[in-house]
Amino acid sequence: MKMNLQKFAGKTNVFPVLDNEFKAGAAKDSATVIADMETFNVEFSNGIETWTPMDTEGWQRGLMTSKGIKITLSGKRNIGDTGNDFVAGKVYKNGHDAEGYFEWKHPDGTTISWTNAIFDVKNIGGGDSTSVGALEVEINGNGKPTITPAV
């Protein structure tokens, strides 16, 4: 897959973070946008095995052998919103019950999705007494994602 990182949504130059879209649900056909999310962070982890053979005169060699993605979303708990309720509903789940469909649509239209992403809910209403209740979740990729390039 080749993404042109200089062209997003048919435009050139920079883009606002709000152009990213996140959906969650039991399956792709029932997934909806998660309302009231304010911030997101993505963390790519890469497994690199290194070794230092004698024939490289002390210079290390390496090979990337694994990948992982973790997406953190933070916002407000919106009771009654389908996507927000789906995520919050994972808070007391374990095992495969903590999994679900998750999709990240990039500003250029590329989508990355998992049918069994792991929802690690961190907060479903906390904050100080004058704050709006929070919803915070880390979505961990679970296996190789489906990557669909923008058309």
What are these regions (language model features)?
Residues 137-141:
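C-terminal edge-of-domain segments
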Residues 1-8:
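N-terminal leader/targeting segments
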Residues 9-78, 116-136:
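Solvent-exposed edge beta-strands and adjacent loop segments
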Residues 7, 39, 108-110:
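Polar/charged alpha-helical tracts
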